[in-house]
Amino acid sequence: MDSWFILILFGSGLIHISANNTTTVSPSLGTTRLIKTSTTESAKEENKTSNSTSSVISLSVTPTFSPNLTLEPTYVTTVNSSHSDNGTKRAASTESGGTTISPNGTYGTWLTDNQFTDARTEPWEGNSSSAATTPETFPPADETPIIAVMVALSSLLVILFIIIVLYMLRFKKYKQAGSHSNSFRLSNGRTEDVEPQSVPLLARSPSTNRKYPPLPVDKLEEEINRRMADDNKLFREEFNALPACPIQATCEAASKEENKEKNRYVNLLPYDHSRVHLTPVEGVPDSDYINASFINGYQEKNKFIAAQGPKEETVNDFWRMIWEQNTATIVMVTNLKERKECKCAQYWPDQGCWPYGNVRVSVEDVTVLVDYTVRKFCIQQVGDVTNRKPQRLITQFHFTSWPDFGVPFTPIGMLKFLKKVKACNPQYAGAIVVHCSAGVGRTGTFVVIDAMLDMMHSERKVDVYGFVSRIRAQRCQMVQTDMQYVFIYQALLEHYLYGDTELEVTSLDTHLQKIYNKIPGTSNNGLEEEFKKLTSIKIQNDKMRTGYLPANMKKNRVLQIIPYEFNRVIIPVKRGEENTDYVNASFIDPYRQKDSYIASQGPLLHTTEDFWRMIWEWKSCSIVMLTELEERGQEKCAQYWPSDGLVSYGDITVELKKEEECESYTVRDLLVTNTRENKSRQIRQFHFHGWPEVGIPSDGKGMINIIAAVQKQQQQSGNHPITVHCSAGAGRTGTFCALSTVLECVKAEGILDVFQTVKTLRLQRPHMVQILEQYEFCYKVVQEYIDAFSDYANFK
């Protein structure tokens, strides 16, 4: 029921009660009460002896006011009866009865049972042979004091009612401001919607007491494991204990009618005390408003501006804010569209220059990487023909790996992304603008990770609960889900356990000298300790369901190497045949583009058709083979191509068109035809012969050459997945994928991170880079590449 309807009913009730209180007795009439009397048969004569009972009772009610009580009268009831032995009057004072509210609504003192018995329930004591009911009229009394008291009481009730109404008005305004509404309506991406959308908010925490103190970093892993038990039960409790928002905060500016269309979600609004104020535009009412809030960093006030993703109608305001706040860095943690819904308007041109209100934006450079894209913009105020006003360089870091649902699979990409943002933002610049769609969930997650990493370095402890509580006082619902909350802890643990392992190419020599030294107190050197950390990563066998199905077990060459569900390569099901969508292969994300590699086992004789169906379905034009068909007398891979002529594998026919021997590998050009579709494609196979049956290659030259040849082929054939296989699809396959990724990063940015590259691969497929020698080989090849960089300048 509507709260206003309830208030009206409540008010009506108060008025009704007040009316009853002030009209209980007419001032001009006495009070009449029916008293039942009884006499003996001989009592007709009034002057008989005391054996006759004359029960004429005189009962008067007179209000008596105590000087100490201003509002409540004390009633003294006097009962006159000739039945008394001495004929005197008996007075019933307040001491013999309890002060209550009488049935007619007036205050009074009720007599006890031995003082007064209602004639409606029991007759008077005595002979009941002749009972009569006689009306008795009390004399009129002056009721003016009663009326005055009741008027005063009514006034107090009315004042109380007004106070409640005013409180409810304030509560409703606060609720409209988005403090703790639980309703939601997801964005549908239509810019013409009349009403802004809303998103789900969490209920207010019933308690703000501090149950979650800061954690020392050496207790971090233990605590995270404890809280993640029982499906993150303790983490959910901690998250639900967070305060939603400060009760005193208001959102008056955001709630104005003129500003409603500027909000993407109706219940995610900036507080008045922390919102970003734009310079008002002359003649445009409320032009100082934008849905953005200042947010503190770890020890830096207003380090960030948390903003909603711009709408089409607020793009100009967004760039006005960037200019006025002297922002140099924009962090975008959403894609323009997710689940076919518009999450953010594209507020930059794809190329060239475009004016947005009074700010002109031109694109200077774009770098696309696997987890994020970096765009550099040059901005200048419009109308500056003389170029007197300086141009400014703005860098946008667009994190593209956040999934539509949940959080990233691993925090590694986010940590690398955050490091880039920290390194790029200049000292002189204003606040870093961070936005997702609503500007609270992913935005809050980014801000908290940044602050807690700073706290970790400064104090050797983290205070996630406390920091989230504080920034929620600046913008509601920062860190919006328990999954985001857990992801923050995972990112902090990742950084604590493994640190920053990224290197500048110029420091590789120093690093290699360091990792070959023995670690004091152990028999291992640094390299062995690094690899030991990699092998300690748990293999998640419970996430390999399809590969372990009985129908698919025989399709696996090595039972310890099964693809994970989340990234396994799926092929079309054969008509009328179940479990024919499985092949032992995994999509792998390298440096620049998602799913750039397919890491596959070497086909078995009975899975060769599935292998070619995979090649056709995913349009792979490059195959890298890192094993011989047979090694040490054991079959390592079925021959899946013809030595000459053509061979059919189901609907796929393969014809050898050309074979060329290079220094350490063979190139075969194959014409692959799908007879069902009547289409053909050219596919090139690179068969590497430089890997010995035991150990690793003696040098990295052959591997560098084949990687360069494959990259060149990719440029010509298009960016479709490169299929890489050895025998089991893990050891040599992982080494090739790791080296391709690291060398590409070296060439593009002059940095490398062998440890995290291999760690990421192992999270995508078990046992990638399988042995210590293969891990060491990665470092050696990178070192060779850097030493002879000029010789491989054409590596693209």
Swiss-Prot record:
Positions that bind substrate: D404, C436, S437, A438, G439, V440, G441, R442, Q480
Organism expressing this protein natively: Rattus norvegicus
Lineage: Eukaryota, Metazoa, Chordata, Craniata, Vertebrata
Ranges where the Tyrosine-protein phosphatase domain occurs: 235-495, 527-785
Keyword rRNA-binding among UniProt keywords: no
GO biological process, one term: positive regulation of oligodendrocyte differentiation
Function as written in the Swiss-Prot or TrEMBL entry: Tyrosine protein phosphatase which is involved in integrin-mediated focal adhesion formation. Following integrin engagement, specifically recruits BCAR3, BCAR1 and CRK to focal adhesions thereby promoting SRC-mediated phosphorylation of BRAC1 and the subsequent activation of PAK and small GTPase RAC1 and CDC42.
Broad class of where this protein is predominantly found: membrane
Active site location: C436 (phosphocysteine intermediate), C726 (phosphocysteine intermediate)
Top EC class for this record: hydrolase
CDD domains, alphabetized: R-PTPc-A-1, R-PTPc-A-2
Cytoplasmic domain ranges by topology: 170-796
Residues in compartment: Extracellular: 20-145
PTM statement from Swiss-Prot or TrEMBL: Integrin binding to extracellular matrix induces phosphorylation at Tyr-792 which induces PTPRA localization and recruitment of BCAR3, BCAR1 and CRK to focal adhesions.
GO-annotated cellular components: focal adhesion; membrane; receptor complex; Schaffer collateral - CA1 synapse; synaptic membrane
Residues modified by glycosylation: N20, N21, N47, N51, N68, N80, N86, N104, N127
Name of the protein this chain belongs to: Receptor-type tyrosine-protein phosphatase alpha
Ranges in coiled-coil conformation: none
Subunit structure: Part of a complex comprised of PTPRA, BCAR1, BCAR3 (via SH2 domain), and SRC. Within the complex, interacts (when phosphorylated on Tyr-792) with BCAR3 (via SH2 domain). Interacts with GRB2.
Membrane topology annotation: Single-pass type I membrane protein
Stated family: Belongs to the protein-tyrosine phosphatase family. Receptor class 4 subfamily.
Phosphotyrosine: residues carrying this PTM: Y792
PROSITE patterns the UniProt entry points to: TYR_PHOSPHATASE_1, TYR_PHOSPHATASE_2, TYR_PHOSPHATASE_PTP
Enzyme Commission designation: 3.1.3.48
